[in-house]
């Protein structure tokens, strides 16, 4: 762990919304009297009917989480309408296309009109409050319009990352019984064309075989590429919008009405539908956006995340727009047309805050400094990281090379389930350590707990838990409250178990050490090992599969697969490549296998349980620390696995 302290820059401290003294005062208030603290900060959004109840939460028994439960509001109203009187002509959204020559700026007035038209299209097609709408779109302005249109009329959106396959889409459609889909003909991502409508057509067929029938598909024209068309089911957005009205009243939404479902990987292989509701989520993401990014009116803020992930929901769309900010949406990738794209965008749009993933930082760091040095980046004030812990080397490169030693780095730890930032520096309050997420946000009570359930004090390492609720917390797993309780509240009774390991140093700084369950964090995206194993075993040549993570210089964690073959099948380069393509087809390109090791047997206990601990060590090339292997049914299997390992680089 890095012990060098990076002080708060004087110019940041001078103008910051929160200094160290205010942080300490507010944090104490938020812990000592959360009811009063969140009653005050709940006023940051506008209410149609004010709340009288603030916090009604329990982590025990049936687990119930309610915030501002008798208040009535609307998320889209707060993100658009309330800004129109004073800021209607301010830029709400800057869109930077995949092509460097394509961009557009949308004011709050224009955003209002786009969202109302979109909402009226949904209503014209019978979509109503409580209906689930699947959104499978590239990073185009219509993706933001679609989300906000759902929020405006009270429909529950389920956004699916545009890299997911037909099978993964179908899983999500079936789970939430969505019958209305919004997609595009195709998507552009770097030099690749993504056949979105084609994927949706296949997903609809799969869902139908599983008993869920999609009735309507709204298609946005992005490339004008050739697509299949089902008359009576498929509708063109550009045709529908031409006769849609430009005004649509915001639905009266109870504070605890669902806002969206976002699916995240589960250790059983079945994706979990994380449910976020209306008011508490919006209070929390707008507050964290304002204070974590020290947002001042007029600044240009850029979160590089895709809308298919929680970062895109909370810190590209809802948090910034609720605060009346200018938020930048980028369709492309950081390395297209070359590795200077991020820095060109920063200069072109005079970006003040850049919030991106360690994966992107490592990839750009690997390209050398020349691309960075050819840009000015003088507009940058703050840098942020999200999605996974950032290693100190990448942190320092980001700080020194990109930020010219003057931009604080906001290393934020949080989850799809938490809704917003949980452990994070505040620019004007927090001295930094490279690789540490530093301190908890207001209202966040952390505990580090050992394997026996003992709470560890002072300098310690163990499992990270949160002992009380916060407004942005997920409320349940969609249609599976039992799994919600089992997943998050059964390991340590009365506490939210994050599934992450954590260290606290002697200065009280927190360091996230990574997942301690069977979830991989690949390029900041969570993938269940069970889901990948299921995909592998569905291949006719595969008898058994076990998947583990290993340190990857770019992606954080790589995907290492151990596979045993069916009788009569022999390993080959062709099969190796076929397995990679098969998993991509089953799950999506995000699940790109990095290493495949063919093995006659997997290490199993006498009861038949695969010893993943051993596989992890071998994948990490750390086989000197295998521990006790005497419980294996056939200990000699380990020697073969070590001899044929695919990763021969020692762990850091």
UniProtKB/Swiss-Prot annotation:
It catalyses: acetate + ATP + CoA = acetyl-CoA + AMP + diphosphate. Keywords: Acetylation, ATP-binding, Ligase, Magnesium, Metal-binding, Nucleotide-binding. GO terms for cellular component: cytosol. GO terms for biological process: acetyl-CoA biosynthetic process from acetate. Its cofactor is Mg(2+). Acetylated. Deacetylation by the SIR2-homolog deacetylase activates the enzyme. The keyword Ribonucleoprotein does not apply. GO terms for molecular function: acetate-CoA ligase activity; AMP binding; ATP binding; metal ion binding. The keyword Transferase does not apply. Mg(2+) binds at residues 537, 539, 542. Catalyzes the conversion of acetate into acetyl-CoA (AcCoA), an essential intermediate at the junction of anabolic and catabolic pathways. AcsA undergoes a two-step reaction. In the first half reaction, AcsA combines acetate with ATP to form acetyl-adenylate (AcAMP) intermediate. In the second half reaction, it can then transfer the acetyl group from AcAMP to the sulfhydryl group of CoA, forming the product AcCoA. Belongs to the ATP-dependent AMP-binding enzyme family. This is Acetyl-coenzyme A synthetase. It comes from Bartonella quintana (strain Toulouse). The gene is acsA.
């Amino acid at each position: 762990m890095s012990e060098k302290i990076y002080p708060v820059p004087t110019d940041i401290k001078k103008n910051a919304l929160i200094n160290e003294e205010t942080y300490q005062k507010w944090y104490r208030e938020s812990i000592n009297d959360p009811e009063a603290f969140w009653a005050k900060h709940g006023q940051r959004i506008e209410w149609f009917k004010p709340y009288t109840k603030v916090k009604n939460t329990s982590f025990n028994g049936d687990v119930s989480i309610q915030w501002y439960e008798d208040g009535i509001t609307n998320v889209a109203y707060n993100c658009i309408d309330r800004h129109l009187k004073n800021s209607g002509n301010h830029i709400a959204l800057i869109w930077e296309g995949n092509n460097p020559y394509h961009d557009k700026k949308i004011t709050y007035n224009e955003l209002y009109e786009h969202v109302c038209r979109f909402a009226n299209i949904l209503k014209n097609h019978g979509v109503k409050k409580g209906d689930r709408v699947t959104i499978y779109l590239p990073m185009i302005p219509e993706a933001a319009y679609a989300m906000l249109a759902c929020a405006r009329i009270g429909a529950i959106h389920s956004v699916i990352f545009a890299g997911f396959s037909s099978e993964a889409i179908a899983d999500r459609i079936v789970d939430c019984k969505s019958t209305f889909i919004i997609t595009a003909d195709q998507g552009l991502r770097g030099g690749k064309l993504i056949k979105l409508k084609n994927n949706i057509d296949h997903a609809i067929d799969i869902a139908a075989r599983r008993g869920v029938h999609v009735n309507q598909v709204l298609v946005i024209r992005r490339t004008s590429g050739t697509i299949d068309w089902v008359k009576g089911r498929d509708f063109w957005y550009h045709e529908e919008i031409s006769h849609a009205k430009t005004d649509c009243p915001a639905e009266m939404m109870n504070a605890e009405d669902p806002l969206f479902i976002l699916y995240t990987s589960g250790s059983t292989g079945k994706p979990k539908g994380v449910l976020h509701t209306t008011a508490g989520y919006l209070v929390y993401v707008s507050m964290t956006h304002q204070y974590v990014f020290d947002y001042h009116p007029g600044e240009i803020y850029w979160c590089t995340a895709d809308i298919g992930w929680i970062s895109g929901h909370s810190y590209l769309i809802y948090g910034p727009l609720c605060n009346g900010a200018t938020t930048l949406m980028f369709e492309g990738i950081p390395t297209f047309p070359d590795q200077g794209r991020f820095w060109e965008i920063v200069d072109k749009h005079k970006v003040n805050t850049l919030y991106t993933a360690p994966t992107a930082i490592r990839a750009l760091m690997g390209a050398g400094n020349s691309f960075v040095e050819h840009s000015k980046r003088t507009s940058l004030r703050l840098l942020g990281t999200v999605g996974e812990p950032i290693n100190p080397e990448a942190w320092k490169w980001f700080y020194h090379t990109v930020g010219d030693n003057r931009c604080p780095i906001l290393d934020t730890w949080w989850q799809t389930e938490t809704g917003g930032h949980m452990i994070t520096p505040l620019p004007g309050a927090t001295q930094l350590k490279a690789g540490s997420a530093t301190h908890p946000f207001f209202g966040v009570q952390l505990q580090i707990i050992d394997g026996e359930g003992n709470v560890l004090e002072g300098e310690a390492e163990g499992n990270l838990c949160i002992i009380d609720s916060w407004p942005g917390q997920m409320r349940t797993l969609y249609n599976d409250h039992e799994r919600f309780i089992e997943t998050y509240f059964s390991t340590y009774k009365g506490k939210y178990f994050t599934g992450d390991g954590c260290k606290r140093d002697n200065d009280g700084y927190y360091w996230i050490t990574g997942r301690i369950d069977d979830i991989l964090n690949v390029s900041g995206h969570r993938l269940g090992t069970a889901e990948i194993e299921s995909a592998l075993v569905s291949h006719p040549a595969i008898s058994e599969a076990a998947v583990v993570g290993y340190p990857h210089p770019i992606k954080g964690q790589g995907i290492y697969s151990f596979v045993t073959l069916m009788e009569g099948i022999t390993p080959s380069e062709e099969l190796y490549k076929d397995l990679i393509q098969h998993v991509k087809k089953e799950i999506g390109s995000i699940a790109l296998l990095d290493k495949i090791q063919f093995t006659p047997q997997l290490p199993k206990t006498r009861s038949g349980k695969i010893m993943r601990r051993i596989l992890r060590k071998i994948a990490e090339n750390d086989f000197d620390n295998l521990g006790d292997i005497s419980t294996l049914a056939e200990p000699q299997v380990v020697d073969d696995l070590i001899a044929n390992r695919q990763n021969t680089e020692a762990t850091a």
